[in-house]
C-alpha cells in the first residue's frame, strides 16, 4: 500500500537511532547484542505503519521484533507508533525484503510475518511477490530449521498463489484460515489495513507454514 510522501520522514528516522537501525549490515550476526538480550527474534517484512509490530511487541515483551519496510514515509509512521507505545523490544529497518541475507546470519531469525503484501497480480510481476520461491530461498536461510512463516492477506488470488508456492517449495502448511475473523483464533493482532478493510466486510486469509 503506497503512502503519500511525508515531509521530514528521513530526519525523523535519523533522529531515533535507538529504534531505527541505520546501518543494519553492521548488526548481522549480532542482533542479540543490538537488543541487549538473547530473546527470540521475530521479523515482519512489509511492516507498514507499524500497528502489527507494535501490538505484537506489547503483547509479547519477551520477544524481540524487527519491522522491515522499504518505504521511507511508511517507516516514519511506524516509528511514531513505536515511540508512542514506549516499547523496548522493537527495531525498525528500511531495507528491501530481497536482501535480508545482507543483514541476518543463517538461522538468526526465529520467526517471520508477512502481512498484506503487495499482490503484484500481473504474471510478469510474479517474481516481486514476497512468497515467490526466490524470496523463500532467502527466508529459509535466515530462519532456523523448520522455521515458521505466518502470512495474512485479503487477496484471494495471492493467498492461493502463496499456498501453492509454499507447498511446491516443500513447506508444511500447519494451519489455514479461510476467514480469520469468523474463526475462533484468539491470537490475532491486526494491521491498520486489516482493521480498515475487515470493518467493511473483507475476508481475511491466514496460513502458518514452516520449512
Curated annotation (Swiss-Prot):
It catalyses: guanosine(46) in tRNA + S-adenosyl-L-methionine = N(7)-methylguanosine(46) in tRNA + S-adenosyl-L-homocysteine. Substrate binds at residues 122, 154, 191-194. Pfam families: Methyltransf_4. S-adenosyl-L-methionine binds at residues 44, 69, 96, 118. Residues 124-129 are annotated as: Interaction with RNA. The active site is at 118. GO terms for cellular component: tRNA methyltransferase complex. Transmembrane segments: none annotated. GO terms for molecular function: tRNA (guanine(46)-N7)-methyltransferase activity. Keywords: Methyltransferase, S-adenosyl-L-methionine, Transferase, tRNA processing. Pathway: tRNA modification; N(7)-methylguanine-tRNA biosynthesis. The keyword Repeat does not apply. CDD domains: AdoMet_MTases (cd02440). Its EC number is 2.1.1.33. Catalyzes the formation of N(7)-methylguanine at position 46 (m7G46) in tRNA. HAMAP family: tRNA_methyltr_TrmB. Belongs to the class I-like SAM-binding methyltransferase superfamily. TrmB family. This is tRNA (guanine-N(7)-)-methyltransferase. It comes from Streptococcus pyogenes serotype M6 (strain ATCC BAA-946 / MGAS10394). The lineage of its organism: Bacteria, Bacillati, Bacillota, Bacilli, Lactobacillales.
